[in-house]
Amino acid sequence: DDEMKVVKHHAYAVSDFTVQVRDALNSEDNVLNDLEKWVNLASVSGAVAKVFRLLRFGIDDYVNSYRVYEIINHDMGKNLRCLGVTDRESRRFTATANHPALSGDESRHGFIGGDTPKGEPMSPGDIERFIYRMVNRWIHHKLSMGILDE
């Protein structure tokens, strides 16, 4: 995946917490990947600040990765397609994170009645790429909307 070739972790002190941002999923030359812009965006957007705080804990568990997904989905008015997230990807992610038949004891729910969701569940690597790509595109979207220019 070309977007995963360049991956960096940035830490920046903001207020009383540290924000760790996985930056440069596209290119270091992309002005929308500028760390200062991301930090400034977090200072004016509570949703961005919360996602950054959650990313500090990692996304290697279904509960935290789902929190990140929920915040972005809500912020985008449940229209993740404009971030390049397909309905199929969203369904695969939510089914994997939620259903114990797909993710075992680590799922968000202890029991879900009915049929097991059809289709291939996301692997942990798939989920990591899905979440970080979505975060990156969401930040780019917000910066492209000129939020910091106001």
Q: What residue spans do the PLM features occupy?
A:
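Histidine-centered, metal-coordinating catalytic motifs and their short helical/loop contexts
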Residues: E70, T86-H140
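Helix-loop junctions and short alpha-helical segments
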Residues: D1-D60, R88-R92
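Long, compositionally biased intrinsically disordered regions
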Residues: S144-E150
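Short helix-loop boundary/capping segments
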Residues: G77-C82
